[in-house]
Regions:
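Structured, contiguous alpha/beta core segments that scaffold functional sites
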Residues: 2-209
């Protein structure tokens, strides 16, 4: 199956390689990170999928659509004030962050993940010279934090399709909220939302009946 976006024909099977490339993904030398607070090094999104509830979805969608109208810009602070930053980065931020979505679609997706999971991850793809090529919001089934012998942090993304990818934590933009008990992740919505969603479903069922 293929689709055309921004004048480029892509095959769904090639999207993973389009984002992460074909490089060596062997990270067997890494070990699980240990946190001082004793929390696990794995984050799994709330299995209740609050976005499946129409009320939660409508609220999130309203916020996401409004924030999707923002115009992101890259600027640099100098001794004489703020000046325009990289032209290529501004094109990525303001026009097409990646081949699969527009700037507004990118923002809407990031905001939706932020409110759904209290953690949104954006993979920063760079070329061999370190120049930013694209920004990809990542859908994931779980995220595991790992560390190497030099104490560099890595994140292993396990995706719904069974594939996984491990990258340096510095290679992602991690936006979080309800950043309280865990040292790295925003708290998941399982306990906070389950009771409210159950009550909301019960009220809807009572109205229908």
């Amino acid at each position: 199956m293929s689709f055309k976006k921004g004048g480029e024909m892509m095959n769904y099977r090639n999207i993973f390689n389009k984002i992460f490339g074909f490089g060596n993904t062997d990270k067997s030398h890494l070990t699980g990170a240990e946190f001082l607070d004793g929390y696990t090094n794995v984050f799994t999104p709330f299995s209740g999928v609050p976005y499946a509830d129409t009320t939660f979805r409508d609220c999130t969608d309203t916020i996401a659509r409004h924030l999707g109208k923002m115009k992101l810009k890259h600027v640099r602070k100098t001794s004489t004030g703020m000046v325009q930053g990289s032209i290529s980065i501004n094109h990525i931020l303001g026009t097409r962050p990646n081949p699969f979505m527009t700037a507004s679609e990118f923002l809407e997706k990031v905001v939706a993940q932020y409110f759904n999971y209290n953690n949104a991850f954006i993979y920063v793809k760079r070329d061999v010279n370190g120049v930013i090529e694209a920004l990809y919001p990542l859908d994931f089934g779980s995220v595991e934090v790992k560390v190497d012998k030099e104490s560099n942090l890595y994140v292993k993304f396990q995706f719904i399709n069974g594939k996984s990818m491990t990258v340096l934590y510095d290679a992602v933009i991690h936006i979080k909220r309800h950043f309280n008990s865990h040292q790295l992740f925003g708290e998941d919505n399982s306990r906070a939302l389950k009771e409210d969603l159950d009550l909301l479903h019960a009220v809807k069922a009572a109205i229908i009946n």
